[in-house]
Design a protein with these regions (language model features):
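C-terminal cap of metal-dependent C-N hydrolases
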Residues: 11, 316-319, 370-436
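Metal-associated gating/positioning segment near the N- to mid-region
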Residues: 49-114
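Histidine-rich, glycine-flanked metal-binding segment
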Residues: 1-54
Length: 440
């Protein structure tokens, strides 16, 4: 095809069937040629670079509306684009909660007006709105339903089986779950945190049993109602053993923080900056997460970008908020793990592109395939970099990886043929669009 808008040339292209040296031709925001491409308005030489399909971060909290001093859709997606991310899924625990069509419409409007990447939103599921979820889960811009079984930032708690089952039994789309048992954690808090301000107790308060029990409860209810559940930020070896046996019902997410940091060191070195829910745990749990990545149990790696200001995080535990920023460092940290042989680059792409397609049924994205959106995450696997607080675009302005030297960096973010980021600089703000999904 002649007169292409853009050719990506001389790079190593990660196609669904594997990596190969081939050209990719783009026109009108779509991939139109995969092969020998000539005659374009612009050609980018990608020698020594890996051309990934556009990668997605499927768990972000951008705090808008209601918490704009921590983050906005604009600043959060700026950070995403700088981190090589072409699209984000944002969570419903804002103020007001994303539990009505009106709240969803507001966030979609803000995304179109201000986002630097494409986007979709989780719709919050509660016992109060459960009777409407069959209809509302299919609204444009919705990537799935989200429930919180354990209290976290925001006010979107479904602690009892009755509350969880009300959501599970209404709807067909994927239901993402924050699985921590609120009742067990409340009992733990009375004893473990009594007269203690030690953040190192965070993984004792929110212990293995609280995670495992909630995961077992929600998977049991999902089986009862033939519902697909996506269990988020798994942290324990016990949960992985259980989920490995229940892949017919549940898909699995892990976070870079749980793959990279471990207790007690993280709490000694970072203090409350390492405080997140579920908590960072001991190394034997981390080893189990890596085993689950290796054997295919894990479907998605996402950031759970959950920013708070340094002032908020510098308070006295346990009154400090849980959560760390991570959308800008998600891919760099995973590239460093790939460089160190912890996983292949193909598996990385699977966890951040094909996994999201499988779990969420994303339409025409996340794959270098003809007629799909021309989204690409281009990385230099050999580039070394030192992560700093100063380079973070998030309003929170910090990262738990400040000062960490890594190998592998995103050098270009292309969204629908538009070069949004190149070599650490934002070049162009796209007109962002809601991500589309295949609905049954």
């Amino acid at each position: 095809m002649s007169n292409l808008d853009l050719i990506l040339k001389n790079g190593i292209v990660f196609l669904p069937q594997g990596r190969t040296s081939i050209d990719v031709g783009i026109k009108d925001g779509k991939i139109v040629e995969i092969g020998n491409c000539v005659d374009a308005n612009k050609t980018i030489d990608c020698t020594n670079l890996y051309i990934f399909p556009g990668l997605i971060d499927t768990q972000c909290h951008f705090r808008e509306p209601g918490g704009e001093h921590k983050e906005t859709i604009e600043t959060g997606t700026m950070a995403a684009a700088l981190g090589g991310i072409v699209g984000i899924f944002e969570m419903p625990n804002t103020n007001p909660l994303t539990t009505t069509p009106e709240a969803l419409d507001h966030k979609i409007s803000r995304g179109i007006d201000t986002a630097y990447t494409d986007f979709a939103y989780y719709f919050g599921g509660t016992i109060q709105n459960s009777q409407n979820l069959n209809e509302w889960e299919n609204l444009d811009g919705v990537c799935g339903i989200k429930i919180f079984m354990g209290a976290s930032t925001g006010n979107l708690l479904s602690a009892t089986d009755e509350e969880v089952e009300a959501v599970v039994s209404n709807g067909q789309r994927v239901m993402a779950v924050h699985a921590e048992d609120e009742f067990l954690m409340n009992e733990n808090k009375k004893t473990i945190l009594k007269d203690s301000n030690d953040v190192g107790m965070h993984c004792k308060w929110r212990d293995v049993n609280s995670s495992l029990n909630a995961t077992k409860r929600v998977v049991g209810l999902a089986k009862k109602h033939n519902r697909h559940v996506h269990v988020l930020h798994i942290t324990t070896s016990e949960e992985m053993d259980f989920l490995r046996k229940n892949k017919d019902t549940a898909t699995v997410e892990v976070l870079p923080n749980h793959l990279t940091l471990n207790a007690p060191d993280c709490y000694e070195n970072l203090g409350t900056l390492a405080q997140q829910n579920p908590p960072i745990r001991e190394k034997h749990h981390q080893d189990a997460l890596w085993k689950a990545i290796e054997d295919g149990t894990v479907d998605i790696v996402a950031s759970d970008h959950a920013p708070h200001t340094l002032e908020e995080k510098s308070g006295t535990y346990p009154n400090t908020p849980s959560g760390t920023p991570g959308v800008q460092t998600l891919l760099p940290i995973m590239l460093d793990h790939a460089s160190n042989g912890k996983l292949s680059y193909e598996r990385l792409v699977d966890l951040m592109a094909y996994g999201p397609i499988r779990v969420h049924k994303i339409k025409n994205k996340c794959s270098i395939t003809k007629n799909y959106d021309a989204d690409f995450t281009i990385v230099d696997p050999k580039k070394t970099h030192v992560i700093t607080n100063q380079e973070q675009a998030s309003k929170s302005a910090w990262t738990p990886y400040d000062g960490k030297k890594i190998t592998g960096m995103p050098v270009m973010t292309i969204i629908r043929g538009n070069i949004v980021m190149r070599e650490g600089e934002l070049l162009e703000k796209i007109t962002a669009q809601p991500i589309e999904f295949k609905l049954d």
